[in-house]
Amino acid sequence: MNRFLSDESIATHSDYVRIKRLKYSIIESSVPKLKGARIRDVYRMRLAPYDKRDALELLSEIALHELFFVSFSHSPYPAADAVRRAYGSEANFLNEVYKQAMSLPYGFLLVYSFGGRIEVRECTDLCSAYYRSAPVLALDVCEHVYFSDYGFDKERYLLAALPYLDLTRLTESP
């Protein structure tokens, strides 16, 4: 990530995730059955609606940020075979990711891999990110990620970040 985000931006974003973890620990202490629960477990739990929503939002946001931090490599990776099969080329895939990310006002752009089939989805409702399956790549398009390095210029951020997406992750099973 330090190829396209400054150390200060990465540290700020890491602190943001740490604060989300602290908030979740407060919810865990007030709802003991949430202690150690995974996202899919929380979906199935009988909880007060606001507890469930808060827990799902925080757990999903933490998980998506952790995925965001590992979705990039130190150098550009060649496209996985699944990318070439689904999109014809790495350039076509990255263009699709770019177009969707540019149109997304906030949230995450998530990439799912289903047995060689690749799907790019917008995610503005954190509770839905892990509902059916786990994404294998995440791109945070909220301004708080890139503002200190790129101002409000999302396009510059995307053009700098996208070449470093670790496309080899698209061959892994979620």
What feature does the model see in each segment?
Residues 1-174:
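Feature for soluble, non-membrane regions of globular proteins
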